């Protein structure tokens, strides 16, 4: 199994919606989460780059789908943050439609990383993202971010509670604590990404079967 070097990850392009994304080939893994879930920090920690994904002081700034290449045909996709109160309702609906469309229609999407603040997990939109992924047979890794904010006992209790709760989705869902500050949980994230990126791209599997 190849262990991909995530430090080589570089920005490729931004797209306002699925129609403007590059060709639907290779393998993509998407990162999704509420606007304050620590998504940009997690991407920066994973790649050991300070500003690969810009951390905005204004949640909800990232309205584009941002694509980063790990290696040829292997991409990380930073989806727009969702659930920020000060974004107009019309824009919220537009984003949610774009997120749903991406999860349902993007053939090269292999896995979804859903990031949630460990203190406030499984909000409605988090559950919606997991539901969309499960409906599309996409594996999910839930990262409970800012795990350093809780003492060890409370952290374990939250992780166990979320692991129990996601059983109701009947999907392939892994739940892990994560802290960008302490760099904890990064190994689990890399292992999961490696397993996704080492699979045969869907379109190549179809060609082999013909």
From Swiss-Prot:
Its cofactor is Mg(2+). InterPro entries: G_ENGB_dom, GTP-bd, GTP-bd_ribosome_bio_YsxC, P-loop_NTPase. PANTHER family: ENGB-TYPE G DOMAIN-CONTAINING PROTEIN (PTHR11649:SF13), MSS1/TRME-RELATED GTP-BINDING PROTEIN (PTHR11649). Mg(2+) binds at residues 40, 62. GO terms for cellular component: cytosol. SUPFAM superfamilies: P-loop containing nucleoside triphosphate hydrolases (SSF52540). GTP binds at residues 33-40, 60-64, 78-81, 145-148, 178-180. HAMAP family: GTPase_EngB (MF_00321). This is Probable GTP-binding protein EngB. One of its GO terms (biological process) is division septum assembly.
